[in-house]
Swiss-Prot record:
It is found in: Cytoplasm, Nucleoid. Transmembrane segments: none annotated. GO terms for cellular component: bacterial nucleoid; cytoplasm. This is Nucleoid-associated protein Pput_1012. Keywords: Cytoplasm. GO terms for molecular function: double-stranded DNA binding; single-stranded RNA binding. It comes from the Bacteria. It comes from Pseudomonas putida (strain ATCC 700007 / DSM 6899 / JCM 31910 / BCRC 17059 / LMG 24140 / F1). Belongs to the YejK family. InterPro entries: Nucleoid_associated_NdpA.
């Protein structure tokens, strides 16, 4: 993963309405194994995050200036350090307006994966831990906690430059606690949502279910194709890449590689050629789950019609091949 440029700044702020103090770095970080490892770990953590949203830049304005500064950098009017400096100063102002925001280290990284260039911007925090030193003493230790990555965005620079009509060249982590916590970061990026990842994924799965039904496939074949879809889509989410409908179609049916793709187009599901799959929605498709008072049921989707039978009229499930541990518990209760 070639890293073109990388820099870190610090915004010191507590979530109590106090002023945000900027500690800006004057030069880029020199290339090192540590930087490469940090970016690799950040990518892995970001790709694994659920609840991301996809979108595109607002028109450049005083409220959303980042895209203009980024364009100046890419066209050589600003160097990377100058771009990151004006950007982090803007973020500092937005943080001060958001009382509940917390400061941290702001990472800017321009890097390349394959033929695609990206800009990653992330707010990083430290965690306190312990370590054993060379004298075998236990000492306090601080490290960047990438597992607690709550505010980050990734801009596909290649897509932005080469596809003016794209509405999904920016991805960002969507906060769970609403506007007060995370919207200031989205406003900093200047991003408006263009693609509903969970909604697009649900539509894709609906199209697939309709396709399987229309093909009247044997149960084993339907199960294999379902597994192929879920595995491919899950792999793409781990890589931070979209699901490509034509590629998915060729994987689902190697003998008729366009069959599923043509089904989607002919039925007009409204899906884009590439969609950002939502991991949580995929997991729901992989398993059926349900809870009621004192009862929890979960089983893999492909077991329906085999080991699990559903009677809609009676509202019952018949489960065959019970787990041995469950059978033993039931026997002990009976005795």
């Amino acid at each position: 993963m070639p890293i073109r440029h990388c820099i870190v700044h610090l915004i010191d702020k507590k979530p109590d309405g106090s002023p945000a103090v900027l500690h800006a770095r004057d030069s880029e970080l020199a290339a090192s194994d540590a930087i490469e490892n940090l970016l690799a770990d950040l990518n892995d953590s970001y790709n694994a995050k659920q609840g991301k949203a996809w979108g595109f830049f607002h028109g450049e304005s005083g409220a959303y200036p980042l895209s203009g500064w980024l364009k100046q950098y890419l066209e050589g009017e600003k160097d990377f350090t100058a771009f990151s400096r004006v950007a982090v100063e803007h973020l500092q102002k937005l943080m001060e307006e958001s009382n509940l925001s917390t400061g941290g280290h702001i990472l800017f990284a321009h890097y390349q994966q394959g033929m695609t260039e990206y800009l990653a911007i992330a707010l990083l925090h430290h965690s306190e831990g312990v370590a054993v030193n060379a004298e075998l003493d236990v000492t306090p230790s601080r490290h960047l906690d990438l597992g607690q990555l709550h505010l980050a965005a990734r801009i596909n620079l290649s897509e932005w430059k080469n596809n003016q009509n794209s509405k999904q060249y920016i991805s960002f982590i969507k906060g769970k606690n609403g506007k007060k916590v995370s919207d200031y970061f989205r406003d900093f990026i200047g991003c408006q949502e263009g693609v509903d990842g969970p909604g697009e994924t649900r539509t894709l799965l609906k199209a697939f279910s309709d396709f399987v039904e229309s093909e009247d496939l044997p149960e084993e074949s339907a199960r294999e194709k379902t597994q192929t879809l879920v595995e491919y889509a899950t792999t793409q989410t781990k890589l931070g890449e979209p699901v490509t409908l034509e590629e998915l179609s060729s994987l689902i049916d190697e003998d008729r590689p366009k069959a599923f793709y043509d089904h989607i187009r002919n039925k007009d599901y409204g899906l884009s050629p590439e969609i950002p799959a939502d991991k949580r929605t995929l997991n729901q498709f992989r398993r059926f789950t349900g809870r009621a008072e004192g009862l929890s049921i979960s089983f893999e989707a492909h077991l329906l019609g085999d080991k699990v039978e559903y009677d809609e009229a009676a509202g019952t499930l018949i489960i065959k091949g019970l787990p041995t541990t469950l059978v033993d518990q039931l026997k002990r209760r009976k005795d």
